[in-house]
Each structure stands twice: as C-alpha cells, then as structure tokens.
C-alpha cells in the first residue's frame, strides 16, 4: 500500500473547482544545482482548459547537449527569456492561489519552491 500524502496544503479544495496543471523543464535533476528553463500551465475547470500560461526562463548558463536533446529547448530560445524572478512572479499571478497538479509534483514543486525562496517570493501551494 502506498501511504504517501496525495494532497499537500489546505484540504478544502475539490477537483470540481478550478485548478492548475503545470510542468517545468530544467537544466538537470538536482534542485540545489540546476535551474528552471520553462514553465507551462493550464487552468482546468470541469475538465476544460480555461487559460494557458507558458514562459521560458533564462538559466544564465549554457544547456548541455543531453538537456537540449531531452527537452528540445536551446540556448537560443533562452537568451532573451525572463529572469527567474520575473518568470515566477508571472506564474504565481497566473496560479492565483488555485491548487496545483503535476506529474511528479514533488520534483516540479521542489524547483518552484527553491526558485521562489532564491528570489524572495512566497510559495505555499496546495498541490497533488
């Protein structure tokens, strides 16, 4: 039996309400050494997409050939992208306090949480 917690944060949200499904791309797997390169999200309500969000994030470093091959994101795509604080500020405005859902949420939430801490933004989401 898997007894891990499925919902983190406030427990009074239902899946009939609006929630945000999101995904990130990064320069690697280690939250303490790597950086976010893209954030994508949609708002779902009653199973329908209501809003969309996408931004690249400038990691201020070159990508490895492995990451380029895995994500399809190139250095050229990131050179004029927003810096982390601006990208996260825009993402948090888009989320607007709604619950978050992600495949492998611990990974994605970990990077968003670390990024917010690094740039001084509050981030205490409800997520599944």
Mark where each language-model region is.
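Conserved non-catalytic scaffold segment of RNase H-like nuclease domains
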Residues: 1-127
